[in-house]
Amino acid sequence: MENQKMPISSVPILKDLSRPIANFPPSIWGDRFINYTCQDENERAQKERQVEELKEQVRRELAATVDKPLQQQNIIDATQRLGIAYHFENEIEESLEHIYLHTYVENTCFEGSDDLYSVALWFRLLRQNGYRVSCDVFNKFRDNEGNFKNNLMEDAKGLLELYEATHLSVHGEEMLDDALEFTKTRLESVVSHLNYPLAEQVRHALYQPLHKGLPRLEAVYFFRIYEAHASHNKALLKLAKLDFNLLQSFHKKELSDIARWWKSLDFATKVPFARDRLVEGYFWVLGVYFEPQYSLARKIIIKVFTMISTIDDIYDAYGTVDELKLFTEAIRRWDVGSLDQLPEYMKPCYKSILEVYNEIEEEMDNQGSLFRMHYAKEVMKKLVEGYMDEAKWCHEKYVPTFEEYMSVALVTSGYTFLTTMSYLGMGEIASKEAFDWLFSHPPVIEASESVGRLMDDMRSHKFERERGHVASGIECYMKQYSVTEEEAYDEFCKRLVKAWKDINEECLRPYHVPKPLLMRILNLTRVIDVIYKNEDGYTHVKKAMKDNIASLLIDPMIV
């Protein structure tokens, strides 16, 4: 049955249809990123030599702090915040293991163990690197009634570090929930009285907590903060700036290659109703992994990302139900012969999907990882079937219960799809067992999907309601529970808190899959927090998104 083809005569001839066209804004970038001038080879080689020399210097300095936990923690923190921790993964792992064993397992006091900043930094570094340390370490900063002591009120630096640490909380840690409320309220009240750079750090953290930010983007912000501290490590800062510029050139070359491929497809002409968001998509992918060793992985996922963005718009911004049934069936068949069954406007997209997957399949075959293609195809089929369900709801003007909506909307968030595709180019670490784990829909995946869906609905439901889109989660929740929009928002915010705690829990040891695979899920979730913080920054590209893209792909660091 699966390989039978619908006769051509059954393809409906549809004229003068009322289509749900969204009138998405065009790309703001034009051909800006197509042309890339390669850096002078001698100049690049010289910078690479400098980077290697500075890396050795930083390694020596890190090794010299082995018996100075606080100093060691500060170097590790700076290295991670400046975006160069990928050069020192083994050294950082060994250092944190040493700190964990000597200060937590053996309960040995360390310099600064009675200082809020030092303890909060210790807690955050260990938690964000997977160590299951207890929040009871903060008991010493609370009075007999369980409130945080009054003498902390003036310790803005310590409060800021505690605030950052609270974002790594898991379920059952009411102390950290209280600490978040306490530190947030206090920092908001004192920020206008602080001096630079602490004032800037507090403002930024209140807007974008470190744990939910994109590492590469947070590094851009942290450069100027770190440099403003008189005690900053000059070798570390220079290394970070040189490395940033080298990587930026590398990313611009990648984007240039992808942009030429994208232009050759001519989707702007062939599928003009869809969002043209290649550059924004590449920014999204950089949020998932920016490190040079993931170049192949980025090239795979960005091509698939552009395809799925276009398919999404075919389903909810142009296609009729009858046309979409044909496309859904064509994806199920996964056969070039299905092209003849599709309306003309669908053919370029379907043909391109098959071509992209064939490219990926060839690469996987070369790596001896052909088994991955089964997962890549299955997750695409499931996503498209979810789009079809939503299209039927929209056509029928059906408002599902919130639970029914979420059962489909978690799939159409695209985050299981993107996670699956993000694993394809990651080498041997992405084993069959890892894909089976992913397809078992573990809590961390459901939590990531929830963040994606809830934040998307909160930021885009008004625009989508105006253009006749399927009812969003906000509308479904309001109708089912007879609540106001504000009350629905409050419930969504509570669910977001729960989802982040689920993610934090899954990122603690022992890991179910290797940590690099978990990091893709965490980073995909972070992308949503950044792009959808105040608006749908992917669909409607405004100043915040433009500035973020410019900081990663246009503006170099001054060394």
From Swiss-Prot:
Keywords: Lyase, Magnesium, Manganese, Metal-binding
EC number(s) per entry: 4.2.3.-
A molecular function (GO) term: magnesium ion binding
Cofactor(s), by name: Mg(2+); Mn(2+)
Residues reported in the UniProt entry to bind Mg(2+) 3: 464
InterPro entries xref list: Isoprenoid_synthase_dom_sf, Terpene_cyclase_plant_C1, Terpene_synth_N, Terpene_synth_N_sf, Terpene_synthase-like, Terpene_synthase_metal-bd, Terpenoid_cyclase/PrenylTrfase
Ligand binding (Mg(2+) 1): 312, 316
Free-text comment on the cofactor: Binds 3 Mg(2+) or Mn(2+) ions per subunit.
Keyword Metal-binding: yes
Positions annotated to bind Mg(2+) 2: 312, 316
PANTHER family cross-referenced by the UniProt entry: (-)-GERMACRENE D SYNTHASE-LIKE ISOFORM X2, OS04G0344100 PROTEIN-RELATED
Protein name according to UniProt: Probable sesquiterpene synthase
